[in-house]
Amino acid sequence: MFWTSVARARSVWKGPNVVDFGVNVQQCIKGNVPIKTAVRSATILPRMVGAQFMVHNGKSYANVKITEDMIGHKLGEFAPTRKAFHYRQTKNR
């Protein structure tokens, strides 16, 4: 299991942040239906592998497909909240 900085800061006796999304995750995997959520702090569990989530990034929802490498991480790590800066070159030079 890979530990994020958020998971390391959390006490061991508290356990992972497990969230009930209000739907059956296994049915969403079979039906290929994305689960829409704003809970970025939810820990990804092994039963979520193969599911698609739409994670809120503050403005819109980012599509995230869960793979085995993501187990133990948080949903919010895969939905960036900030835009990457791109320097625009001018043609006058």
From Swiss-Prot:
One GO cellular component, as annotated: mitochondrion
UniProt GO BP: mitochondrial translation; ribosomal small subunit assembly
PROSITE patterns recorded: RIBOSOMAL_S19 (PS00323)
Pfam families in alphabetical order: Ribosomal_S19
Keyword Ribonucleoprotein in record: yes
Superkingdom of the organism of origin: Eukaryota
Localization of this protein: Mitochondrion
Quaternary organization: Component of the mitochondrial small ribosomal subunit (mt-SSU). Mature yeast 74S mitochondrial ribosomes consist of a small (37S) and a large (54S) subunit. The 37S small subunit contains a 15S ribosomal RNA (15S mt-rRNA) and at least 32 different proteins. The 54S large subunit contains a 21S rRNA (21S mt-rRNA) and at least 45 different proteins.
Family: Belongs to the universal ribosomal protein uS19 family.
Function statement: Component of the mitochondrial ribosome (mitoribosome), a dedicated translation machinery responsible for the synthesis of mitochondrial genome-encoded proteins, including at least some of the essential transmembrane subunits of the mitochondrial respiratory chain. The mitoribosomes are attached to the mitochondrial inner membrane and translation products are cotranslationally integrated into the membrane.
Identification of the protein by name: Small ribosomal subunit protein uS19m
Species assigned in the record: Schizosaccharomyces pombe (strain 972 / ATCC 24843) (Fission yeast)
Gene: rsm19
